[in-house]
Amino acid sequence: MNRRMAIQQITASAVLLGATTARASRADGSRIGGAGSDGRGAQAAATATPTGPYTLPPLPYAYDALEPYFDAETMHLHHDKHHQSYVDKLNAAVEGHPDLSSRTVYDLVANLDAMPMAQLAAIRNQGGGHANHSFLWETLGKGGAAPSGELAKAIDAKFGSFSSFQEKLTAAAVGVFGSGWAWLVRLPGGVLAIETTPNQDSPLTVGHTPVLGVDVWEHAYYLKYKNKRPDYVKAYFSAVNWDAVSAKFADGKKA
């Protein structure tokens, strides 16, 4: 499979709910407002910036801090084992390539179409896993409740109400076939949308800024919830740090 086919698969796999969009392009094929050489900041601004050689970011809370929604054992395995594995394999893939390892992981996945073919699969899968999980940990915390301020207004404007948004994101997350993620994203034009990505694909690859992400890989919930993904997704909303999510939304608006 060549690079063009690989990127086309990622673009085709992003399922948007409540919006019909296309990735805007200039006549020369470069992206407008996306993550290209002159636009990558719009996505990276909404995330932290772990740089290479890549390291596992510490959890910003204790393993048991999200009980009873996420159990301590799952959090330990999810962070220390699964996420660490993505970091290790990404480092192995970019070893000896300072042109790659000097870039943030978000920059790598945002510019996947510019990656060397030899490293493309590893950056897509392992880099995506590192980027997605680094983002996830920052948006969880004791909280629940509901968003406020500008994010609440944007959600109401797009989805009608917070409860309607919850229903749509839940349906998207529960409906992912196999492993993947459900996302609330900010599109290049500023509109919110819900989309899903398979495996560890990132919204950044298609120029979308992640605001909130639900990991529906079984390793995220199977120890506690077994095959009851709907119960896990319901519990997820009680573990969202809406202040952190609102900050990412605000950062995305500035970029």
Describe the predicted segments one by one:
Residues 1-17:
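N-terminal secretory signal peptides and thylakoid transit peptides that target proteins
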Residues 23, 138-147, 224-229:
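Short helix-capping/linker segments at secondary-structure and domain boundaries
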Residues 14, 18, 86, 90-98, ...:
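A generic secondary-structure signal for well-formed alpha-helical elements
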Residues 171-226, 234-243:
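An amphipathic alpha-helical core segment
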Residues 231-255:
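N-terminal targeting pre-sequences for secretion and organelle import
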Residues 49, 69, 81, 92-102, ...:
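All-alpha RGS (Regulator of G-protein Signaling) helical domain and cognate RGS-like helical scaffolds
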Residues 53-85:
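Mature N-terminal segment immediately following signal peptide/propeptide cleavage
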Residues 21-66:
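C-terminal segment of N-terminal export signals and the immediately downstream linker at the start
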